Amino acid sequence: MMIQTRTQTLLPAVARIAAAAVLALAAAGVVAADAASAPAAAPKAVSKKAAANLPSFATPEAGFEALVAALRAKDAAELDRLFGPAGKRLVHSGDVEADHASWANFVAEYDAKHRIEMLADDKAKLSIGTTDWPMPIPLVKQATGWVFDTDAGDEEIIARRIGRNELDAIEVCRAFIDMQRDYAEVDRNGNGLLEYAPKLISSPGKHDGLYWPTSAGEPPSPAGPRLARANPAKLAARSAATPFHGYYFRILTRQGKHADGGALDYRVGGNLVGGVALLAWPASFLASGVKTFQCSMAGKVYERNLGPNTAAAAAKITAFDPGPGWNKVE
């Protein structure tokens, strides 16, 4: 079915768009042209205190080789050592699987092609891949040697990660509509009704959510396990929730007065037959995402910046209600 095909290809498509990426490498081919054409910024000194706590290298080559070795080994502790405490959030998005995939992408691009460019006598950057994608964290020369300047790359890395994660969240919202249509094509509980799934994860032994484990030869469930695990409210322990490319997701079973048709409960006689909606919010505001998104079966996705208290604000959203402050995603 068309819906199953799109659902099954969601994860690789999302990975191509933006894998909650450390060092912004998953989308190297997308951003290379713009980044390469941007004028080089003037060298900015790393603070003496920060430089003193960072490992230094005799040459830029040695520094970048140490980085690649850490990424190749998936050595998170070594990455933390190279970039220091201030750079820790730059290499950890909160989604370990996506981070590891991004590190592997970096290494593959590096192995295919790489070059070091001297932006000044005391500043060097690494470009990788056939598109010569520039790594946003340069090496700068200090009294002790060459060190990674995480301050220089901070804003750029976070901006790229957020941009990709938000594109992912939008794509998930659109795929969610197909998943629910797929789900509703079959009577999943034997009550004679075609209903939407009221939750992401099915109860053990049931098909009352978008995801359930399957055996070899069985048709896949509409959603994959990683997306299903991205709902902290429905899991027994919040620590078990894993953001899906930097975002959490929750199904909504009502709509408010600002939705088409006005306020209504999608449940009729306890059965979810009148519609369904989805809410997506960043796991870490300003680190994994900025915008919160919501969509319904009408096919429209809306976005809004809920601010620093996004998690608390999202927890209060119980209905699809794109009122003032919510903008349609084009």
Over which residues does each language-model region extend?
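Flexible, glycine-rich surface segments
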Residues: 183-287
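N-terminal secretory signal peptides that target proteins for export/translocation
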Residues: 1-13
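Short beta-strand edge/turn micro-motifs at domain boundaries
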Residues: 124-127, 131-167, 171-174, 300-305
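Surface-exposed, charged secondary-structure patches
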Residues: 87-135, 238-245, 249-258, 263-272
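Short, well-ordered alpha-helical segments enriched in acidic and aromatic residues
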Residues: 75-87, 193-197
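C-terminal soluble interaction/assembly domains
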Residues: 274-330
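Bacterial N-terminal signal peptides
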Residues: 14-29
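Short, low-complexity N-terminal intrinsically disordered segments enriched in polar/charged residues
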Residues: 36-73, 117, 153-178, 182
